[in-house]
From Swiss-Prot:
UniProt family annotation: Belongs to the acetokinase family.
Site, as annotated: Transition state stabilizer: H179, R240
GO BP: acetate metabolic process; acetyl-CoA biosynthetic process
Residues bound to substrate: R90
Organism field: Lachnoclostridium phytofermentans (strain ATCC 700394 / DSM 18823 / ISDg)
Subunit description: Homodimer.
Pathway(s) it belongs to: Metabolic intermediate biosynthesis; acetyl-CoA biosynthesis; acetyl-CoA from acetate: step 1/2
Keyword tRNA-binding assigned: no
GO CC terms: cytoplasm
Record function comment: Catalyzes the formation of acetyl phosphate from acetate and ATP. Can also catalyze the reverse reaction.
InterPro entries xrefs: Ac/propionate_kinase, Aliphatic_acid_kin_short-chain, Aliphatic_acid_kinase_CS, ATPase_NBD
Record-given protein name: Acetate kinase
């Protein structure tokens, strides 16, 4: 079976065509600047990268161009649209309606739309991508895979906020969590790599990228996670503040004469390590600045690592123990300094890091010493493959 995996943003569209038998990506690509001038970058598994500058006025045109690239006689990987057996769509927010992936029908589309208030930047774009694919491939089964679904196993004590219960009743204000597809894939892979029984395991997954979140996965189920109603809660991130005193919003708004929307924009797009360091949202730039003596850059890195470690500690309490701590996503997979800084806070647990193994980038391996009481691991995430597997199970 060939599965087309679509991740649709407001002005971009990532895709992979995956052979579900070999679990290999036959082609990967990205449509950028949709609605502006348009650019499609396409690469087949054994071919050169192709960059096509072409107008992409909307997502339907972008999907048509993706199909054309996949079928191109020079760099394509299929000869007919009929070779695409199913399409898997990443959907950011499923609210409480979706605890699992589902085959898309009109009822599902309506339910996704009802969650738009919870993810106004993402869900509408996800729906546009789904509808564009449906118009081009009306007879191909489509599956929605939700970022929030994996975390629907959290108990109430983990997802309820200390606010009037009526807001949960009326508006479903609660912790939802995100990056669920990644947390699910990585936690399962971790139990295999560590030789653990998934039904008797306690794994903490640190998904550290420009967006970052941590989850506590007990016996294969998410029991807590750092992101909340929105992806703004939790860890300090590239541009997001993460946890803070809510009164700061009112305080800054009054001091700076800003509207609520302006303050929220600052917390989402101008805070995190970017705001703290004054350098960049890219940890490579911040580390370079820190090495040159920039104190704000040093502080941003130290606070980031401390916050990660503090969450790890709290999730050990949530699960009454831990077997493995796993680093994944761009930063977690590639930044040895961040992994070492976080792990240094965990030495009281008997954590012992192998410096040579930790120096490797982007490889799946155990980076703790054999005598470490908790396994520390690096597992590259593969959300597209995880979505493909969900699709195969349902169709």
């Amino acid at each position: 079976m060939k599965v087309l995996v679509i991740n649709c943003g407001s002005s971009s569209l990532k895709y992979q065509l995956i052979d579900s038998v070999t679990e290999q990506a036959l082609a990967v690509g990205l449509c950028e600047r949709i609605g502006i001038d348009g650019r499609l970058t396409h690469k087949s598994a054994d071919g050169e990268k192709v960059v096509l500058e072409d107008a992409l006025p909307n997502h339907e045109v972008a999907i048509k161009n993706v199909i054309a690239a996949l079928m191109n006689e020079n760099y394509g990987v299929i000869k007919s649209l009929d070779e695409i057996n199913a399409v898997g769509h990443r959907v950011v927010h499923g609210g409480e309606k979706f605890a699992h992936s589902v085959v898309i029908n009109d009822e599902v589309l309506n339910a996704i739309e009802e969650c738009n208030d919870l993810a106004p930047l993402h869900n509408p774009a996800n729906l546009i991508g789904i509808n564009a694919c449906k118009s081009i491939m009306p007879n191909v089964p489509m599956v929605a895979v939700f970022d929030t679904a994996f975390h629907q196993t959290m108990p109430k004590e983990a997802y309820l906020y200390g606010i009037p219960f009526e807001y949960y009743d009326k508006y479903k204000v609660r912790r939802y969590g995100f990056h669920g597809t990644s947390h699910s894939y990585v936690s399962k892979r971790a139990t295999t790599l560590a030789g653990l029984d998934v039904n008797n395991s306690k794994v903490i997954v640190c998904h550290l990228g420009n967006g970052a979140s941590i989850s506590a996965v007990k016996n294969g189920e998410s029991v807590d996670t750092s992101m909340g109603l929105t992806p703004l809660e939790g860890l300090i991130m590239g541009t997001r503040s993460g946890d803070l005193d809510p009164a700061i919003i009112d305080f800054v708004a009054k001091k700076e004469n800003l509207s609520l929307d302006e303050v929220m924009n600052i917390l989402n797009k101008k805070s995190g390590v970017l705001g703290m360091s004054g350098v960049s949202s890219d940890f490579r730039d911040i580390e370079a600045a820190a090495n040159e003596g920039n104190e704000h850059a040093k502080e941003a890195l130290a606070v980031f690592a401390y916050r990660v470690a503090k969450y790890v500690g709290s999730y050990i309490v949530a699960m009454n123990g831990v077997d493995a701590v796993v680093f994944t996503a761009g930063l977690g997979e590639n930044d040895k300094n961040i992994r070492a800084a976080v792990s240094s806070h965990l030495e009281f647990l008997g954590v012992s890091l192998d410096a040579e193994k930790n120096s490797q980038r982007g490889k799946e391996l155990i980076i703790s010493n054999p005598d470490s009481k908790v396994k520390i691991m690096v597992i590259p995430t593969n959300e597209e493959l995880a979505i493909c597997r969900e699709v195969v199970e349902l169709v």
